[in-house]
Amino acid sequence: ITYEVERFYARMKGDGNEQAPSYGLNSKLTKRNGELVELKWTEDGLYGAAIKEIVSWLLRAQKYAENEEQKHLIDLLVKYYRTGDLKDFDRYSIAWVQQHEGMIDFINGFIEVYGDPLGLKGTWGGIVEYKDLEATKRTQTISQNAQWFEDHSPVDPRFRKPEVKGVTANVICAAMLGGEEYPASAIGINLPNANWIRQEYGSKSVTIGNLTEAYNKAAQGNGFRDEFVIDEDTISLMNQYEDITDDLHTDLHECLGHGSVQDAIRQ
């Protein structure tokens, strides 16, 4: 079965098409009369009742958008939910990664593929977020120097991007979590996942500040430091710097880790 699925999507992608959509991301495969058939997750398809609700709430939210670009983003996303066409999703993803104005942003769709052993099928997730402007000064220092980090990365030069495009990084507060992001999201996210979009248009990185703060506070007083840290001076250093350096580690991971390097095959 695995071989059949891989061959099914390989035929869709074709040879040498670097800008092929992420085939399989929003569908279920089943067999009918011995042939593989793809059932799309759309407003009028599989899971249509739930997707109708997603579309309905997106359209209600649209009137509260901060600018015309955000309204356009919602139009593109709604179109994708209605057509199920992954080229529509790519058009939405390109517009999303280029939209930086305003305090509010969102992630919405069948995006992450961690739950699929073949790395094809997306799980639905949603976040509504707003910027932490003070903490974002930290991440923007990193993103504004992304080219320097790329040029000095200790990897084979073939994997370095000659020109880093569109790498942005913000610290945000999650106002809403849904789908696989609920009840506990990842503390950092970098999207979109399509390599060709990242190469040509860039990526967005976020560190979810109110979640990392909550996790850090929940871990206080659990006895770990008293039991395992060697002395009071080290405990004092950890109390002073551990949380901020942990956040900085997430910033570096999302912005410079996911946002860097290129496929050698492009060379």
Question: Language model features by range: what are they?
Answer:
Residues I1-T30, G34-M238, E242, D246:
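Contiguous, non-catalytic segments that form substrate-binding/exosite surfaces or channel walls
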Residues C255-R266:
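Catalytic Zn2+-binding segment of zinc metalloproteases
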Residues I244-L256:
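Short alpha-helix carrying the canonical HExxH Zn2+-binding catalytic motif
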